[in-house]
Each structure stands twice: as structure tokens, then as C-alpha cells.
Amino acid sequence: MNKAKIFMNGQSQAVRLPKEFRFSVKEVSVIPLGKGIVLQPLPNSWKDVFQEMAEISSDDIFPEGRKDLPPQKRKYFE
């Protein structure tokens, strides 16, 4: 398991990432997940955003052979 060091940088808390986890961008988004967080790189420009969107295949979003669940029976408000 890889570890990262947490330290204070002025009034902010910072994380020193191991070399293999370095980001190539200047900013990341911080997403809370349970008791932890997920860091994701933010694109540097709109050009990067559109390039990333172009790389997404519809098969990644809607895989072939995906089955929909049957409709659920629900109690209506009375």
C-alpha cells in the first residue's frame, strides 16, 4: 500500500504524493467519498475538456447487451 504524507502549509493542510501519483495539471477536484476523498485532475483548458469528451465511447456509457430492469410496483399516495 502506498502512503502519502500530510503536512501544514501556512494555514492549509497539504498532501505530499508519492512520485508515481503526481499530476500533470495545476489543479485537481476534491470529491468526498465516505471517510476519504478522491482527487481528479481538472483540465487545463476547454480544448482539453472537448478532447477528453471525444475520447469517450458510447459503448463506455451504454454497454452492448445491457438489460434494463423491469418496472417496479410501487404504492401510490392515498
From Swiss-Prot:
InterPro entries: Anti_VapB2-like (IPR047976), SpoVT-AbrB_dom (IPR007159), SpoVT-AbrB_sf (IPR037914), VapB_TA_antitoxins (IPR051734). One of its GO terms (molecular function) is DNA binding. Keywords: DNA-binding, Toxin-antitoxin system. PROSITE patterns: SPOVT_ABRB (PS51740). Transmembrane segments: none annotated. The keyword Heme does not apply. It comes from the Bacteria. Pfam families: MazE_antitoxin (PF04014). Residues 4-44 form the SpoVT-AbrB domain. The keyword DNA-binding applies. Forms complexes with VapC2; probably VapC2(4):VapB2(2) in the absence of DNA, and VapC2(4):VapB2(4) in the presence of DNA. Crystallizes as heterodimers with stoichiometry VapC2(4):VapB2(4) in the presence of its probable promoter DNA. The heterodimers are in contact via alternative VapC-VapC and VapB-VapB interactions. This subunit contacts DNA. Belongs to the VapB family. Antitoxin component of a type II toxin-antitoxin (TA) system. Upon expression in E.coli or S.cerevisiae neutralizes the effect of cognate toxin VapC2, partially inhibits the RNase activity of VapC2. This is Antitoxin VapB2. It comes from Rickettsia felis (strain ATCC VR-1525 / URRWXCal2). The gene is vapB2.
